[in-house]
Amino acid sequence: MAESPQNLVGPQVRRLRIEAGLSQEALAAKLQVNGWDLSRAGLSKIEAGLRRVNDAELWVLAKTLRCQLTGLYPSKPANVSSVVRNGGK
């Protein structure tokens, strides 16, 4: 079985960042202004689905990207059924 990503929001963060015309460096700087000390490398890992994002971080992302929390999630995540079947493991 293919390993599922550690987060579902990464691709949407990347899409919203690009739509806002921001580089990873610029978004990381804006996140830092809003209270999240995140490097460009950390943001890259989030966008790639390799780093988890906790609840507080989701709020900062939504605020910084000027979107609703629901805007950070895909409309239909591809791997939800496997996560549910495996008990989130």
Can you say where each PLM-predicted feature lies in the sequence?
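Short, charged recognition helix plus adjacent turn
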Residues: 2-3, 63, 70-89
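Residue-level detection of the helix-turn-helix DNA-binding "recognition helix"
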Residues: 6, 18, 32-33, 48, ...
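DNA major-groove recognition helix of helix-turn-helix/homeodomain DNA-binding modules
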Residues: 50, 54-71
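Short alpha-helical DNA-recognition segment
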Residues: 20-46
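A short, Lys/Arg-rich alpha-helix, primarily the initiator
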Residues: 1-19
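Residue-level signal for the short linker/turn that defines the boundary of a DNA-recognition helix
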Residues: 11, 21-22, 38, 53-56
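Residues at secondary-structure transition points
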Residues: 4-8, 37, 48, 52
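Hydrophobic packing within well-folded, soluble alpha/beta domains
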Residues: 13, 17, 27, 61-62, ...
